[in-house]
Amino acid sequence: MRSWYRRPDVLMLDNPVAVSDEENTGREYETIVILELKRPMRDDYTNSENPIVQMIEYVEKLKTNTISDKYGRPIRVGDDTQFYLYAVCDVTPKLQKIAKMYNFAETPDKLGMYFYNDNINAYIEILSFNKIIVDAEKRNKILFDKLGI
């Protein structure tokens, strides 16, 4: 692990709303989404330095309840907080081998991999750049056809 502070590329939190006659001091988030972006065709991953380990480390850091948002407010995480972790990268043979060690399964289209980690309440998905493009084209096909694009 590098000596400088590591953080995810994108961290999305649900917007908690509480109604009370007392001042809201913040509550635990129900859902946290982490998006990790990697350089296309990167293939220098190791068993200890890869997007899977990186994202799990982010969750472990958040679970310490010592991380703050950009306003300095603590990001409160509880035992029931659900995490959704997405790594956007090319699924190279090396990354595929590492993912299989974590019991990841291939998506039906074989363009990505996924796994649910019960220990940290996290759904983890590795999305290839090709999968994102193919899925977007499928999702928007009717719209593009109607627009004549």
Predicted regions, residues:
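Charged, terminal alpha-helix-loop-beta segments
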Residues: 1-149
